Regions:
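Short, hydrophobic/aromatic-rich beta-strand segments within well-structured domains
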Residues: 73, 99-103
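Catalytic core of Fe(II)/2-oxoglutarate
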Residues: 90-91, 96, 105-167
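Non-heme Fe(II)/2-oxoglutarate
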Residues: 1-61
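Short, conserved, surface-exposed binding loops centered on an aromatic residue
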Residues: 29, 61-66, 89-94
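A structural signal for well-ordered alpha-helical scaffolds and beta->alpha junctions
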Residues: 49-56, 67, 97, 153
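Conserved short histidine dyad/triad with adjacent acidic residue
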Residues: 42-45, 74-93
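A short coil-to-beta-strand element that immediately follows conserved catalytic motifs
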Residues: 65-73, 112
């Protein structure tokens, strides 16, 4: 199964992950997860990239979004790690239009935390469980956070961009 294979690819590179940063650098009281930017030699996860490219083309045809690039990384939240309330594209400054999270871990229980908490355009909050093999897509300007995880939580986080990625 694809999800299992990409999970194994992620885990095989876990020693290469680095502390995730925000614009101001590594700030552990805002973000404590670890990431590894996807590289062309990651052949299994490259299929995820291709799927997002096809999805981007469909969005462009339907909504004229002008998506040109995909920026993505593996993300690992160890027990006790989180990402505080933020927007992936504050004030439409960085070209990120659609955010995507694809959950890679093999199993998940509701009491393990690690939920994505997301505020919609009407101000309503939604809690999304990080279920294995689930993909979540949302507008990058929406306020959201990752609640404290009690177990290792793995994902591919991606952004569909209207400009060239900065990494």
């Amino acid at each position: 199964e694809y999800q299992h294979a990409v999970s194994q690819e992620c885990l095989s590179h876990l020693n290469e992950f680095r502390n995730a940063a925000i614009q101001n650098g590594v700030v552990s009281n805002i973000r404590s997860d670890h990431i590894l930017w996807l590289r062309p030699e990651f052949q299994i996860s490259h299929l995820h990239t291709q799927t997002l490219q096809q999805f981007s083309q469909a969005l462009n045809r339907a909504f004229y979004l002008g998506i040109k690039e995909i920026e993505e990384h593996f993300a690992c939240y160890h027990a006790g790690e989180f990402y505080a309330l933020h927007r992936d594209n504050p004030k439409a400054k960085n070209g990120r239009m659609i955010s995507s999270v694809y959950y890679l871990h093999e199993q998940w229980q509701a009491d393990w935390g690690g939920e994505l908490r997301l505020q919609d355009k009407n101000g309503q909050w939604h809690i999304i469980q990080p279920q294995p093999n689930r993909i979540v897509l949302f507008q990058s300007d929406l306020l959201h956070e990752v609640l404290i995880s009690k177990q290792q939580r793995l994902s591919i986080t991606a952004w569909l961009r209207s400009d060239t990625a900065l990494v």
